[in-house]
Curated annotation (Swiss-Prot):
Gene name of the encoded protein: Pth1r
Keyword terms, alphabetized: Cell membrane, Disulfide bond, G-protein coupled receptor, Glycoprotein, Membrane, Receptor, Signal, Transducer, Transmembrane, Transmembrane helix
Annotated GO MF terms: G protein-coupled peptide receptor activity; parathyroid hormone receptor activity; peptide hormone binding; protein homodimerization activity
Topological domains annotated Extracellular: 27-188, 240-282, 343-361, 429-440
Protein name: Parathyroid hormone/parathyroid hormone-related peptide receptor
Location(s) in or outside the cell: Cell membrane
Record's comment on post-translational modification: N-glycosylated.
Membrane topology, record value: Multi-pass membrane protein
Keyword Signal: yes
Span of the annotated motif Important for interaction with G proteins: 474-477
Cytoplasmic-side positions: 213-219, 307-320, 383-409, 464-591
Length: 591
């Protein structure tokens, strides 16, 4: 038994949901607007009008003959009519009508009621059709019902001049019983707080890494690019929500009734000239998709970089940094531009939402490929970590300690590789009810929105090198502030940790004619008595590679790349390879 045996079990546990239904990963952020719904309704109406012409022609031939109308069966399930090649939902038997009156008679003519294309109805029977899938928030497993009376007319609502229809099964997802308002309010709060905290923490992290010159190295450059992608993703989500807030929201869906669906369906489709009004939401959706894709690809770049450091003995970091930059920002721009071109030419309607046909795969396939590839890299790195732990700690620690080290390293890598995406990916997004659905949505909203915050905490604020630079900068600032305050009060007393130095102007005789000189023309020992103290550097002067602190911080070795120094990691522009001993030191830092 060894720590290396955890890796195969972990791979088997996490790989299945990734390969089974990874496609649901991107659809979680999809937005369905009212304009898109109107477009789908009018497209369904056009298809129904074409079908009605053929069916009415067939019905006229039937009524001209003396054969009457006899339904094929009463099973209530759709079947395919061989004669015309069209689908005709079969009728459900109405037990209130005598059997003899249902055998022959004039059928109810098919028609479009602004929601469903109703087929021919057998006299005296209830016609059931599946809830249309082009109504986004319908329960697509239910049915809508109409009744055809014995005279061959659709039954009307008593006292109203409209046809009776029952859409209760289709509307069950829109009731307050299944879509509880407090659940969605809580999810919205998690969503907003998470992305806000991620945006704020990532902004601070980028400023820290950019400010300190000693933190400038390839590893931190890649971190900064990934942080920036998280920031742009969060900002684009807020902008997209603000632009599309007037769309087909959950509040509207809860209040939606059959009559309102008829009103929506009767709105004429917008003319081509009105497409200019969609420019704002289309730009918002396009930038959201681009920054979403770049975020996934910079997560993949982090995985590729770490994988290359471990498995490549000669790895030119500066040389590959440009390639990583083009890969992370340029490749998503290519397939997003292709998607924009396809939408603009083939489906230039509404706000260019992803849910329009199979065109969404132009963006989803590259993103899902990056997720699967990053997951494979994660499993391989965990496998190597387990092997190295078993080899380096053989005979020095027990198995439980090895497991704890492996678990700690794994948890550090989880937010970097986005492994949390795989937990609920096998569950469909259509089941908008139940305890399991609520657990899934709370989990995904929490980790998706807070992922940037976790990454900033682990890879910047908990980085020992970053903490050391902040302490040095704080000590220099407080020392300079204390020196200025003492100088204004007539004393040059200052302190540096436990060390105290004091030079007073009263120690100089009045006959000497001297005052406390603060000019840099004096020797360093006189003008700046603390210049030889540990860690001192002139304000504004760049740090040198030879500058070291006499007292170093104890950094745990198994914190991985969190506390690795930037010194010595980057190579010269000539692309000289790192010697094998340095690679071994880097590997020991990982462990």
């Amino acid at each position: 038994m060894g720590a290396a045996r955890i890796a195969p079990s972990l791979a088997l546990l996490l790989c299945c949901p990734v390969l089974s239904s990874a496609y649901a990963l991107v659809d979680a952020d999809d937005v369905f607007t009212k304009e898109e719904q109107i477009f789908l309704l009018h497209r369904a109406q056009a298809q129904c009008d074409k079908l009605l012409k053929e069916v009415l022609h067939t019905a006229a031939n039937i009524m001209e003959s003396d054969k009457g109308w006899t339904p094929a069966s009463t099973s209530g399930k759709p079947r395919k009519e061989k004669a015309s090649g069209k689908f005709y939902p079969e009728s459900k038997e109405n037990k209130d009508v005598p059997t003899g009156s249902r055998r022959r008679g004039r059928p109810c003519l098919p028609e479009w009621d602004n929601i469903v294309c109703w087929p021919l109805g057998a006299p005296g029977e209830v016609v059931a059709v599946p809830c249309p899938d082009y109504i986004y928030d319908f329960n697509h497993k239910g049915h809508a019902y109409r009744r055809c009376d014995r005279n061959g007319s659709w039954e009307v609502v008593p006292g109203h001049n409209r046809t009776w229809a029952n859409y209760s099964e289709c509307l069950k997802f829109m009731t307050n019983e299944t879509r509880e308002r407090e659940v969605f309010d809580r999810l919205g709060m998690i969503y907003t707080v998470g992305y806000s905290m991620s945006l704020a923490s990532l902004t601070v992290a980028v400023l820290i890494l950019a400010y300190f010159r000693r933190l400038h190295c390839t590893r931190n450059y890649i971190h900064m690019h990934m942080f920036l992608s998280f920031m742009l993703r969060a900002a684009s989500i807020f902008v997209k929500d603000a632009v599309l807030y007037s769309g087909f929201t959950l509040d509207e869906a809860e209040r939606l009734t059959e009559e309102e669906l008829h009103i929506i369906a009767q709105v004429p489709p917008p003319p081509a000239a009105a497409a200019v009004g969609y420019a704002g939401c289309r730009v918002a959706v396009t930038f959201f998709l681009y920054f979403l894709a770049t975020n996934y690809y910079w997560i993949l770049v982090e995985g590729l970089y770490l994988h290359s450091l471990i498995f490549m003995a000669f790895f030119s970091e500066k040389k590959y940094l440009w390639g990583f930059t083009i890969f992370g920002w340029g490749l998503p721009a290519v397939f997003v531009a292709v998607w924009v071109g396809v939408r603009a030419t083939l489906a230039n309607t509404g706000c260019w939402d992803l849910s329009s046909g199979h065109k969404k795969w132009i963006i989803q396939v590259p993103i899902l490929a990056s997720v699967v590839l990053n997951f494979i890299l994660f499993i391989n790195i965990i496998r190597v970590l387990a092997t190295k732990l078993r080899e380096t700690n053989a005979g020095r620690c027990d198995t439980r300690q090895q497991y704890r080290k492996l678990l700690r390293s794994t948890l550090v890598l989880v937010p970097l590789f986005g492994v949390h995406y795989t937990v609920f990916m096998a569950l469909p997004y259509t089941e908008v009810s139940g305890t399991l659905w609520q657990i899934q949505m709370h989990y995904e909203m929490l980790f998706n929105s807070f992922q940037g915050f976790f990454v900033a905490i682990i890879y910047c604020f908990c980085n020992g090198e970053v903490q050391a630079e902040i302490r040095k900068s704080w000590s220099r600032w407080t020392l300079a502030l204390d020196f200025k305050r003492k100088a204004r009060s007539g004393s040059s007393s200052y302190s540096y940790g436990p060390m105290v130095s004091h030079t007073s102007v009263t120690n100089v005789g009045p006959r000497a004619g001297l005052s406390l000189p603060l000019s840099p023309r004096l020797p360093p020992a006189t003008t700046n008595g603390h210049s030889q103290l540990p860690g001192h550097a002139k304000p504004g002067a760049p740090a040198t590679e030879t500058e070291t602190l006499p007292v170093t911080m104890a950094v745990p070795k198994d914190d991985g790349f969190l506390n690795g120094s930037c010194s010595g990691l980057d190579e010269e522009a000539s692309g000289s390879a790192r010697p094998p001993p340095l690679l071994q030191e880097e590997w020991e830092t990982v462990m």
